[in-house]
Swiss-Prot record:
This is NAD(P)H-quinone oxidoreductase subunit 4L, chloroplastic. InterPro entries: NADH_UbQ_OxRdtase_chain4L/K, NUOK/Mnh_C1-like. GO terms for biological process: ATP synthesis coupled electron transport; photosynthesis, light reaction. It comes from Marchantia polymorpha (Common liverwort). The keyword Plastid applies. The chain crosses the membrane at residues 1-21, 30-50, 63-83. It is found in: Plastid, Chloroplast thylakoid membrane. The lineage of its organism: Eukaryota, Viridiplantae, Streptophyta, Embryophyta, Marchantiophyta.
Length: 100
């Protein structure tokens, strides 16, 4: 059963990395980053259940990761909204805000 869960997690992780590398839209890149975080959470819960099912350390750690991912998504979407108000675009290749 562990192999199936790890295969699912690896598949989600690969989809997230592929989407993060190839996406030109910033909102889509944030969604792919969340997909990567969810793949990591699945791994944590699976290994926690496989190694020691009497303790819930992996589940608690994944709850912390979900909270951090929610904060990251909130901050990321706020930045995207601020950039969209200034530039009228969410394409990553059009952002040159740090150039002089």
């Amino acid at each position: 059963m562990l192999e199936h869960i790890l295969t699912l997690s690896a598949f989600l992780f690969c989809i997230g990395v592929f989407g993060l590398i190839t996406s030109r839209n910033m909102v889509r890149a944030l969604m792919c980053l969340e997909l990567i975080f969810n793949a990591v959470n699945i791994n944590l819960v699976a290994f926690s259940n496989f190694l020691d099912s009497s303790q819930i350390k992996g589940e608690i750690f994944s709850i912390f990761i979900i909270a951090i991912a929610a904060a990251e998504a909130t901050i990321g979407l706020a930045i995207v909204l601020a950039i969209y108000r200034n530039r009228k675009s969410t394409r990553i290749d059009q952002f040159n805000l740090l150039k002089w």
